[in-house]
UniProtKB/Swiss-Prot annotation:
Keywords attached to this entry: Cytoplasm, Methyltransferase, rRNA processing, S-adenosyl-L-methionine, Transferase
Name of the protein in its database record: Ribosomal RNA small subunit methyltransferase C
Function, as annotated: Specifically methylates the guanine in position 1207 of 16S rRNA in the 30S particle.
InterPro entries, per the entry: DNA_methylase_N6_adenine_CS, Mtase_sm_N, rRNA_ssu_MeTfrase_C, RsmC/RlmG, SAM-dependent_MTases_sf, Small_mtfrase_dom
Subunit architecture: Monomer.
Main location: cytoplasm
A GO MF label: nucleic acid binding
Length: 343
């Protein structure tokens, strides 16, 4: 994480303005500018574990990862630089949380790509920190205002839920498929065999729907779920609890915090990181799976049909199968055999 995003490049045009500021960086922190910008003091808060990993190496305890920021996370800051995400409800959750903690008079900067909908920050913050556009470059907008009134923030009001075949799915802003089960996950679920046993790892678990649906017809599986997203981790825990399913859920950058081996790894891996297309997570998932599968264990993933995963599967496992497909999606299966590279 060394090259700066367009949003950070816009901020750097104003770097002189930040030298005396005590800044809290938050939102979609796609690079390490928070650790490198010359300021009086810098903190960062993120809901993304992989962003925290990068920033904490340089910022130590001044980089925080959690679903909800606390007063300690914003202590002594007089400026907020918020990177607008692609998901408006996610921005609403984060900004209301942060502005409820920061003191009146705090300088508020919001920056983001135009295609992300950053313009809607003006309306969102109109009652609390009226914004004006102060720069436009690199297809991004930079907005500035001053906090005039702290909003009230109640994280519980942001929870949502929906039902899938009698299962209750709990969701939060920023969680994949927040409003219903996506088509890719439906296809993957259709391939899971009832009465399966053994240890199952759900990587990129989102709201936990794959795991609870699997556990309903295979109650003897032992579930472990992980995701980079703090909202996803909390949503999965809530989904498991709502359906009486046991499982361990934790934050992890693909396999970074995963220990041990499993009989099956399932995933609907992301191919976007913020506004950017990225195949890194899925390729890391495929290549790293061999270090976390028992002999005879399998990796089963669903992906958009156009994504170039077959080559990586063959390179890693020696072969793969397509066990279900539609015009848009394919479910891939690869077995841990002696042919597989041991990582």
């Amino acid at each position: 994480m060394s090259a700066f995003t367009p949003a950070s490049e816009v901020l750097l045009r104003h770097s002189d303005d930040f030298e005396q500021s005590r800044i809290l960086f938050a939102g979609d922190l796609q690079d390490d500018l928070p650790a490198r910008l010359d300021t009086a003091a810098s903190r960062a808060h993120t809901q993304q574990f992989h962003h925290w990993q990068v920033l904490s190496r340089q910022m130590g305890d001044n980089a925080r990862f959690s679903l909800v920021a606390t007063a300690d996370d914003v202590a002594d800051c007089n400026t907020l630089i918020y990177y607008w995400p692609k998901n408006k409800p996610e921005a609403q959750f984060q900004l209301m949380n942060l502005l409820s903690l920061l003191p009146v008079g705090t300088d508020i900067f919001v920056v983001g790509e135009n295609r992300s909908g950053v313009r809607s920050a003006e309306q969102m913050l109109a009652d609390y920190a009226p914004l004006n556009k102060v720069d436009s470059a690199r297809r991004c907008g930079l907005y500035f205002g001053r906090l005039e009134k702290q909003p009230e923030f109640d994280a519980d009001k942001f929870w949502g839920e929906y039902s899938v075949d009698g299962l209750t799915v709990k969701t939060l802003p920023g969680v994949f498929s927040r409003d219903g089960l996506d088509v890719g996950s439906q296809l993957l679920l259709s391939t899971l065999t009832p009465h399966t046993k053994g240890k199952v790892l759900d990587v990129g678990c989102g709201a936990g729907v794959l795991s609870v649906a699997f556990a309903r017809h295979s109650p003897k599986i032992r579930l472990t779920l992980c995701d980079v997203s703090a909202p996803a981790v909390e949503a999965s825990r809530a989904t498991l609890a709502a359906n009486g399913v046991e499982g361990e859920v934790f934050a992890s950058n693909v396999f970074s915090e995963v220990k041990g081996r499993f009989d099956m790894i399932i995933s609907n891996p992301p191919f976007h990181d913020g506004m950017q297309t990225s195949l890194d997570a899925a390729q890391t998932l495929i290549r790293g799976a061999v270090r976390h599968l028992n002999s005879g264990g399998e990796l089963r993933i669903v992906a958009n049909a156009f994504l170039p995963y077959p080559d990586v599967l063959d390179e890693t496992f020696g072969f793969h199968e397509v066990i279900a497909q539609t015009g848009r999606f394919k479910v891939y299966r690869a077995i841990m055999t002696r042919q597989a590279k041991k990582g």
